[in-house]
Amino acid sequence: LSSEAIEAIYLEIFAVSRNLELPQKVAFLGPVGTYTHQAAESRFGAMSSYMPISSIEGVFRELNNGEAKYGVVPIENNTEGAVGITLDCLRKYENVKIVAEIYMDIHHSFVSLNENLSDIKKIYSHPQGYNQCHKFLDDHNLNSIEFIPTKSTAQAAYLASQDPSSAAICSKIAAHINKVPIMFEKI
């Protein structure tokens, strides 16, 4: 087994044993299928109860009100740096503390119901995901296609699943949840 597989097994065993005591309510920046959702599941395992929340501050409110025991929000990424709203919420909600960090490699996929790149008329994605993939877009002459910003890459995948003339930049899991074929991985 690879070291990644061993680590994944260890984390799942750890999460299951912790949840045998009491299933955890975990709030995360949603919707389902976001990278934050993936991070939450990798840390807390299959036995926890997950609550997708539409904003970072909303996750903090759930924690502050006792509706969730843990929250998962982005705090930093390699391309855009610190996530300002998360830092602001850490100052505002003084009783909410960081108890663990989750390091996660982000790998975007380019997905579409359409098999022909030349037939794609618009690309959905969160602005951050779109900006992170500028080299891919340039290399495939896609940077002139209309970009439609979304609240999350998971929402982008959903919208692409409804329109064959569109594509999305999203996570692999968001593509699978929304049944949108992956044209390119790790873009």
Go through the PLM ranges and name each one.
Residues 1-187:
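Domain-level signature for soluble enzymes in the chorismate/prephenate branch of the shikimate pathway
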